[in-house]
Amino acid sequence: MSFAATHNLDGRTLTVDELWAISAPGEKVAVTPEGWARIKASYKAPIDAATDGRDIYGLTVNYGALKDQKVAGASVEAEPNRSASIKFNERQMRIQAAGLEPYFDDRISKMAMVIRLNQMAAGYTGMSEAAANAFQEYINNDVCPLIPSRGSEGANDLSMATHIGLALMGEWDVSYQGKRVPAAQVRKQLKLQPYHPFGMDGISILSNSNVAEAQSIAAVKKAEHYLALSPVDIASSLEALNGNVSPFLWHTVETKGWPQGHEAAEAVLANLKGSYLWKKDAKRYLQDPLSFRSAGYILAAAMEELNQTKGLLNTAINHTTDNPIVNTEAKNDRWYSNAEVLDEMRAGKPTVYVNSCSNFDNTQLALQMESLTKALGQVMHISAWRTTQLVDDHRTGLPTYLVAKENKGSDGFANIVLTAELTLFFTAPLFGPLTTLTAT
């Protein structure tokens, strides 16, 4: 039996593993008092900067090539500017929302909302308390906006995250209790107060990488599952081949010294406790094919890439991909801190900044995900090679496809071998250059 839990979001300590747990149905979140304080301070910064006469991207001026176009006056919170800001934000949600099915899984949708709420608690977004409450209500009631998985406009997934904003406004469909339901209907059923995106809410909802980060985390959890099974696969293959434990022993791996080498090798050996492979056998080959001998190091490479990817994502979900960014706890101890140009970026206090940036650039995450993908490709590739080796009667001394001679007309495990061979043939180009593991 499992029990739902409430997880605290402070904008500082959320991890990939905790986020994945939160994405399960029934799990709830609560912003810490420190998080709420940062949300309030972050919201105030761009409002104050606009009041001082600064043009704030997405708040007082339009987006992109239209950034010279005014959308609200300096006193943004006062009418008619407040209504103009809400109208602008709502219009942008409707303009940007486009995409094609299939829709993302509910867990990805929920993670995307949790990431955004946690980043609000970090104090980097400039979003309102009303926005934070709206996100929290959907998360805690498992109301998951339908997000098309195809049709992103490019940098920062503008079209994807916009569907979350539309659903918060009650203008799109959500997944609720296993069904596709109009958001307006669910909001009425749950008696939620109307939400109108004001100020920085609009640009901060639609222009961020939270959906991409949620996708990446879902992929990482799959990779984690596959790699957890890999030591069992390697160990069982060694047993089937009457293979050597030599490449996996501590004093062997120690001479290589690469990251995760010992962890991978020990994971394999743990599955060989009590195995006949620990006994002498005159029939055992001196060394095994590379797909067996190198399996530990290739698994180690994938484990290291997984760790690197999780580390980068742990950083990402506690920071932000917004433009502009708000930082209410900025340091002023740099050599350039007293430069005149920085005065134009400060919002009242010396430690409060609203800066134009390109935090939406995800080159590092994209490259890291590619590295993880290639590493998983290596693991899959040699697993397929091991399968082909295990039905080679010259290697094992067993009948072809494990079909007994008297069993006429049977194909035995032929389909498994064919699947492995097709895997080798069709998937190798997907992962880029693979190590030179031939059929040895």
List the model feature ranges, each with a label.
Residues L238-H381:
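Accessory "access/gating" subregions that flank catalytic or transport cores
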Residues D361-T440:
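C-terminal catalytic subdomain
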Residues A97-T255:
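Active-site cavity-forming subdomains of large catalytic enzyme subunits
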Residues G35-D55, A134-S149, L192-Y195, R346-V354:
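Short, hydrophobic/aliphatic alpha-helical segments
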Residues A24, K28, A97, E137-C144, ...:
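Generic secondary-structure signature for well-ordered alpha-helical cores
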Residues A65-I86:
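Glycine-rich loop at the start of a catalytic domain that most often binds anionic cofactors/ligands
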Residues M1-G53:
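N- or domain-start disorder-to-order transition segments that initiate the globular core
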